[in-house]
């Protein structure tokens, strides 16, 4: 049992709030709520799932910062820079548990579908992260466009766009439209390439993390592999493909 009133446990709980307290876009949670509404659900019913998805984003960032040896996150030192790698990993693990607890707290009829979606999403994200890390370890800079897009689909697109859209449909007890997955893959890849560009063109104090870190750590990014102009061109192409995939999708769009 937990020691009653142990100040170190209170500190541990506070550390779990570090990244959420720094803010962030809330993109994934907001997209999930919008998808739930578009499918006819009350967005309030989706709030626990949206909160769990934001917890997912935050514990993944804690671990990602360790794996990437990042210096900053959201305008402040990365957690492992403040408390050390072992403590930061443990904090991320606890946040991971909090995510599952948030999902298990509901007895809604869609719970099993949502749990399965989360499990699948986490597995795909881990696969994408492994590819990214493996390329760094191997010093790979011969990655072609197809391999890069396959990596970011797993690492970024699924949990950033595809899963939020599908989860919103699950909360509405509606089968996810396959066009969402098609569009989500395109939008997620565009999101990652924009992030790659921010690392090249952004300023640390604006983007909230160390600019130039990807190049410094030997990461394979779209601008690094194919050039900045090609990055902007691919973003425009991916956005167009996403709009085409979503054409004709019906639902609440106001």
Q: Language model features by range: what are they?
A:
Residues 250-254:
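Short, intrinsically disordered, charge-balanced linker/junction segments flanking boundaries
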């Amino acid at each position: 049992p937990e020691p009653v009133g142990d100040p170190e446990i209170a500190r541990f709980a506070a550390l779990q709030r570090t990244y959420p307290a720094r803010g962030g876009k809330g993109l994934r949670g907001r997209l999930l709520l919008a998808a739930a509404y578009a499918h006819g659900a009350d967005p309030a019913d989706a709030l626990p799932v949206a909160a769990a998805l934001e917890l997912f984003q935050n514990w993944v960032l804690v671990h990602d910062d360790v794996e990437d040896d990042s210096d900053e996150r959201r305008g402040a030192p990365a957690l492992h820079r403040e408390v050390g790698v072992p403590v930061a990993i443990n904090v991320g693990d606890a946040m991971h548990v909090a995510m599952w607890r948030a999902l298990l707290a509901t007895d809604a009829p869609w719970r099993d579908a949502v749990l399965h979606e989360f499990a699948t999403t986490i597995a795909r994200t881990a696969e994408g992260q492994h590819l990214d890390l493996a390329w760094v370890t191997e010093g790979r800079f011969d990655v072609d466009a197809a391999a890069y897009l396959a990596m970011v689909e797993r690492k970024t697109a699924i949990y950033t766009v595809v899963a939020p859209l599908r989860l919103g449909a699950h909360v509405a007890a509606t089968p996810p439209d396959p066009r969402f997955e098609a569009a989500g893959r395109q939008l997620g890849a565009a999101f990652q390439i924009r992030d790659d560009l921010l690392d090249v063109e952004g300023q640390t104090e604006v983007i909230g993390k160390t600019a130039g870190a990807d190049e410094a750590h030997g990461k394979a990014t779209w601008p690094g592999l194919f050039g900045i102009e090609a990055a902007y061109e691919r973003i425009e192409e991916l956005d167009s493909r996403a709009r085409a995939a979503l054409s004709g999708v019906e639902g609440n769009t106001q």
